[in-house]
Amino acid sequence: GLPDAEDLPMCDEGWEMACQAAAERRVDDVHLLQTQRQLAQAGRWDGVYILSVMAGLETSVLVDADDQVFIDWGTAGQVTLQPPVGGRLPFKLWVHTHPRFAAYWSSTDTNSLALGSGILQTAMVLGQPGPKHSINRSMVEVNHSEFIREQGPLSQWTEEAPRYY
């Protein structure tokens, strides 16, 4: 099972079924999506990352103002977000994975952050050695001095080193 999962609302069997679905790339499997949602709600990003690595595919988790969780799966190198129907602005968090790769902001990611500057509070990319966070200072108060860019919309997003899982 998933380490330190005693407090999560899922059993070992549910985790194993989700892992099997991920390994078989059945990204619309109800057990996989339910487990991923539970992990996201619990802030267990290590579990979300493990499922992404097992599938060899990028995945995205979007959390809206009401804590609704929207999940998308993509290819090995990109995940396209579907419209979060019923979601409410602002979005609290956008998380996506770089399975088996470094946690960094790719050009696609920074384009997404720039476009989301008016509706997204925080973002995270899951990769190696752990999650890389960024906070949108135009929406959330931050005590931080480094930003992704010096000018333009990316000057609102903090530049932070990855942390360990």
Tell where the protein language model's regions lie, with residue ranges:
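Conserved beta-strand-loop surface patch within small alpha/beta domains used
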Residues: 1-93, 100-165
